[in-house]
């Protein structure tokens, strides 16, 4: 096992209540099997409640408190990375999804991003632009992480790639609003 990612909703149920103890348990596992960088091998995917769910003051308070705790832990390198899934943002991007299709769509989207990066990092090529060590370095950099995939329509222009990348970072399905100037790592595969 190279990495453990704990997935939890932060609205105040069992996910929010168990996420930090599960992070600690996963770190103990890596220490037990002899890994010295346990905190760098455990990450968290935290999903924010929708606006409708946050109509409950209890849910809104629980989510705020848990995300504050997770962000502090990620910033102090207690685990890496913290990936925040903004369910309300996804709901707005896919307004016609039924309740039954909503959660599988979110889950497939996030797991699909990991799948793409796993495939790209392990693809044989004469030109190695993103190898497993690069992927590992990005995953081990502390703090919050955003991921995205985009096509480049105007790849022959001087700014086509940078415009596509900028657009993707601004419209990622994951949570947004991060100051990218404070990023400690980045990876791009064209």
Task: Give the residues covered by each predicted segment.
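Tubulin/FtsZ superfamily GTPase core signature
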Residues: 1-190
């Amino acid at each position: 096992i190279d990495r453990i990612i704990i997935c939890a909703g932060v609205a105040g149920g069992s996910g929010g209540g168990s996420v930090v103890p599960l992070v600690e348990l996963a770190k103990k596992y890596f220490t037990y099997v002899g890994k010295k960088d346990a905190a760098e091998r455990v990450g968290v995917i935290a999903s924010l409640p929708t606006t409708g769910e946050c109509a409950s003051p209890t849910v809104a308070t629980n989510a705020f408190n848990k995300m504050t705790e997770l962000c502090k832990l990620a910033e102090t390198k207690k685990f890496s990375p913290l990936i925040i899934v903004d369910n309300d943002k996804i709901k707005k991007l896919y307004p016609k999804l039924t309740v039954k299709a909503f959660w599988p769509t979110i889950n497939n989207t996030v797991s699909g991003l990991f799948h793409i990066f796993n495939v790209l990092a392990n693809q044989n090529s004469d030109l190695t632009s993103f190898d497993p060590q690069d992927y590992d370095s990005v995953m081990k950099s502390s703090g919050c992480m955003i991921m995205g995939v985009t096509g480049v329509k105007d790849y022959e222009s001087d700014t086509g790639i940078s415009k596509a990348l900028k657009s993707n970072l601004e419209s990622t399905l994951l949570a947004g609003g991060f100051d990218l100037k404070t990023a400690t790592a980045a990876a791009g595969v064209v």
